[in-house]
Amino acid sequence: MEQAPPDPERQLQPAPLEPLGSPDAVLGAAVGKETEGAGEESSGVDTMTHNNFWLKKIEISVSEAEKRTGRNAMNMQETYTAYLIETRSIEHTDGQSVLTDSLWRRYSEFELLRSYLLVYYPHIVVPPLPEKRAEFVWHKLSADNMDPDFVERRRIGLENFLLRIASHPLLCRDKIFYLFLTQEGNWKETVNETGFQLKADSRLKALNATFRVKNPDKRFTDLKHYSDELQSVISHLLRVRARVADRLYGVYKVHGNYGRVFSEWSAIEKEMGDGLQSAGHHMDVYASSIDDILEDEEHYADQLKEYLFYAEALRAVCRKHELMQYDLEMAAQDLASKKQQCEELATGTVRTFSLKGMTTKLFGQETPEQREARIKVLEEQINEGEQQLKSKNLEGREFVKNAWADIERFKEQKNRDLKEALISYAVMQISMCKKGIQVWTNAKECFSKM
């Protein structure tokens, strides 16, 4: 069954795109014109345009991770990791950085911040958080979320998350984000007071819109398919990398057997002993070097994982668009139904089977006064419906314009970051191979001197 062609009057139409600035690693917070839209609707949460905090260059870092024990909401003891967030103002006069704020946050507070941003900025591809538990691990890597190496990688990921928000032209001005960096006490209460949970779209409603929307925007449909494919490709890449890491670890560690054998052999040789002993030492160094190599690899894997999770952020924007398109179509359908009812009452003809037609046949016609009263009510509802439809159309067009501009910004960022990560990974592999060549060259010299 062919899909009906989109109705241009009922489908959300884009406005001309306005490219946004690309993110920087450090906040250069010259804040200009206020951005209209979701930030202004933030239930009394003001943007940070005029705050002196953003009129300086700010460095944001997650400098430490600390294991702590406390009581949860159920009054049960739990162990968790807290992260120290430091913000520093870079003074232009002498170039020295001055510590302005320092506070501790739990991972759950980072999650709360992101949930808030998703609700109030639905047209933005909100940066993802690093994984809460290790995924795509190879067998020698600990999957424990309290493992020091994993906690360190997550610390780096959380810092990157804050820098992504801080470098975004709209998110950086949000007051809740500012308070996240500066207000340690009662921050959760401040977030909850915005009422963002009540404004969040239900999963059931979003799923319903996905299957029932009649005129989806092809660009957002294609974007959703792209995000699925991107997630699939990066997942496969990470699985392959984990398998390679497993095998590479085994190959390197087996070289430790060379070292042991050469050392044992050197004990029974007089003339060849020194050369064999030296060669064995080089083999031991080679075998132990894989631990640092694979630890470095994890950082590149984490960069890929960030875009694995970005795929879900893209889908969140697409789901919001589907919801708005579905609401628009339902409003148009309701308006058309009321216009038909009004026409039927005015002419006295019923075009289709209806409960009203049945009651008329059973109980007789309405009096002219009753019919006039009903027509008047319907006309008022039609006027309200037309205004509502117009408002939804304008809101939808604004959403498409802002969302597509941010998606273009995200694509530029993605291309730049993934290119850099893949090149760095290739350079690391080349360096690893060169070290292997150097080890065997040294071993060859040892054998030559025997």
Swiss-Prot record:
It is a peripheral membrane protein. One of its GO terms (cellular component) is SNARE complex. Keywords: Acetylation, Endosome, Lipid-binding, Membrane, Phosphoprotein, Protein transport, Transport. The modification Phosphoserine is found at residue 22. The modification N-acetylmethionine is found at residue 1. A 1,2-diacyl-sn-glycero-3-phospho-(1D-myo-inositol-3-phosphate) binds at residues 106, 108, 132, 154. CDD domains: BAR_SNX4, PX_SNX4. GO terms for biological process: endocytic recycling; positive regulation of autophagosome assembly; protein transport. It comes from the Eukaryota. It is found in: Early endosome; Early endosome membrane. InterPro entries: AH/BAR_dom_sf (IPR027267), PX_dom (IPR001683), PX_dom_sf (IPR036871), PX_SNX4 (IPR034902), SNX4 (IPR034783), SNX4_BAR (IPR037430). GO terms for molecular function: phosphatidylinositol binding; phosphatidylinositol-3-phosphate binding. SUPFAM superfamilies: PX domain. The keyword Transport applies. Residues 61-187 form the PX domain. Residues 1-46 are annotated as: Disordered. Signal peptide: none annotated. Involved in the regulation of endocytosis and in several stages of intracellular trafficking. Plays a role in recycling endocytosed transferrin receptor and prevent its degradation. Involved in autophagosome assembly by regulating trafficking and recycling of phospholipid scramblase ATG9A. The PX domain binds phosphatidylinositol 3-phosphate which is necessary for peripheral membrane localization. Heterodimer; heterodimerizes with SNX7 or SNX30. Interacts with WWC1/KIBRA. Identified in a complex with WWC1/KIBRA and dynein components DYNLL1 and DYNC1I2. Interacts with BIN1. Belongs to the sorting nexin family. This is Sorting nexin-4. The gene is SNX4.
